Amino acid sequence: MESGDELNQYSAMITDFIHNCREAEKGFISSQEWWILSGFVKVQIFLTSLNDNAELIVASNLFKYHVQNADINEYLLKLNGTLKLKGVCFGIRNKHLILSYIRPVQGLNPEELERIIAKIPVIADEYDD
């Protein structure tokens, strides 16, 4: 199977998943970008455009984080070092505190995709205070 075909296969899998979330507010940006609202958490889903090493990126902006706080940063780094986040990690992107999960698409199946997407709002709810 060609790398481009694999990326299209995973794009179709994600699109099918989003379509099956009938009640959820959602959006289709492109064949490589989607979003879904889970509670108050907007989960963004991306496929990289790298044909040979395509990756799935599932992320959410938690809040604006213009002025960084050393104590918060240290706490988040310590959380990232535990197993409590189940593969999800905190980070900073475009002056926002984010949660993200990155995985190569090789071997991804619909059940795992659903679990990955579901992790972000659960962890966001747990640590939003």
Q: Model regions: which residues?
A:
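Charge-rich, low-complexity N-terminal segments
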Residues: 1-44, 82-85, 89
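Short beta-strand micro-motifs enriched in acidic
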Residues: 46-50, 91
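Well-ordered alpha/beta subsegment
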Residues: 85-118, 122-129
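Short, internal acidic amphipathic alpha-helical interface segments
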Residues: 57-96, 102
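Ordered, soluble secondary-structure elements with a strong preference for glycine-centered loop motifs
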Residues: 4, 8, 66, 107-114
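Short, surface-exposed beta-strand-loop junctions and turns on beta-sheet-rich folds
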Residues: 51-52, 64, 105-107
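Hydrophobic residues embedded in beta-strands of well-ordered beta-sheets
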Residues: 34-35, 54-56, 97
